[in-house]
Amino acid sequence: MNPPAWKYRGIVFARAAALLVALPVVAFAASPSDAPTVTFRKIFKSSYPEFVEIKVTQRGTGTYDIRQLDDEASPAPFVIGAPLTQRIFELTTKLRNFQGLDLDVHRRIANLGEKTFRYEKAGETHEVKFNYTLDDSATQLLNIFEGLTRQESDLSNLERAMRYDRLGVNDAVRQVEADYNQKLLPEPERLLSPLDRVGADTTFVDIARQRARALATRIRAAH
């Protein structure tokens, strides 16, 4: 069951406030339009989520908005590491900043959701839309953004369970563990803070605490 909208907005606001405090002042020293930005958008009606939009600047700052189409837009700030940021822009360069690009296979296949890549810099804008592509660079870029979608969803679900559904924390940690095992999370170290809090909090069930500690240990050992 999806959480009440006010609870989800509370989680997003809390994460946004904490992130704004933590971000270096230099990140806001220049106008956002000064930094090249890559945007990924996916619209897939009757799925969950139906709408995803992730924006990443060349500084590694950005926003994510993951929701159903009927929900109010609620983009929240987030950051990614320098290596992942560099990889996103390397792939974008290989794809000519999406200028004059045709990625779709143009075959009769199932609707997998409309995806959009967009590049913006100082008034320059290029974008490409597709349902399915065989282009290797585009597939790699898509996998990164799909992974970020999964990662931010896992993080929000875990933090929501910690606040409002303590008995559901074990299920949330187990989902993070499953996604980590399948190598779906581009930066699993971003989940260490909530995992550590679960592991140290005696108000959560023992199995959740044990699982969180074990997963955090694995992530630290690998990253």
Regions found by a protein language model. Give the residues of each.
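Bacterial N-terminal signal peptides that target proteins for export
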Residues: N2-A17
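Hydrophobic h-region of N-terminal signal peptides that target proteins for export
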Residues: L20-A29
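Short, well-ordered, aromatic-rich surface patches in folded extracellular/luminal domains
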Residues: F28-F44, L101-H223
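Extracytoplasmic
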Residues: A35, P49-F51, R59, P83, ...
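Short secondary-structure boundary/capping segments within folded domains
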Residues: I43-S46, E53-K55
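Short amphipathic beta-strand/extended segments with alternating polar/hydrophobic composition
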Residues: E53-T57, P75-I80, G123-L134
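N-terminal, post-signal-peptide region of Sec/Tat-exported proteins
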Residues: K55-R87
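Charged, amphipathic alpha-helical segments
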Residues: L84-H106
